[in-house]
Swiss-Prot record:
Function as written in the Swiss-Prot or TrEMBL entry: May play a role in the early stages of epithelial differentiation or in apoptosis.
One cellular component term from this protein's GO annotations in UniProt: nucleus
Protein name listed in UniProt: Death-associated protein-like 1
Tissues expressing this chain: Expressed in hair follicle, corneal epithelium, epidermis and footpad epithelium (at protein level).
A Pfam family hit: DAP
Amino acid sequence: MANEVQVLPSPLKGRYAPAVKAGGMRISKKQEMGVLERHTKKTGLEKTSAITNVAKIQMLDALTDTLDKLNHKFPATVHTAHQKPTPALEKAAPMKRAYIIQQPRKC
């Protein structure tokens, strides 16, 4: 019996901490490292988002300039491309169908 090696149970079960029973319900423990990572502020992200916003604005300006140039060259083509075709006949709304229930209703 002295030669047997005791195997200590690992603190994680299936990569997650074991649940704690409180008030007849099982509640999972939250890891301390996850809480610390969530509250840390990332300063590098703010700088990159400002740069990407400027790049997006410049891209949109270039796009609107090219669309304006095309609109001046081909005004009729651009106008007809954005219009929906008008239907020859308008669809009539179908009558509402009466649902036949073969079982008596609960009152």
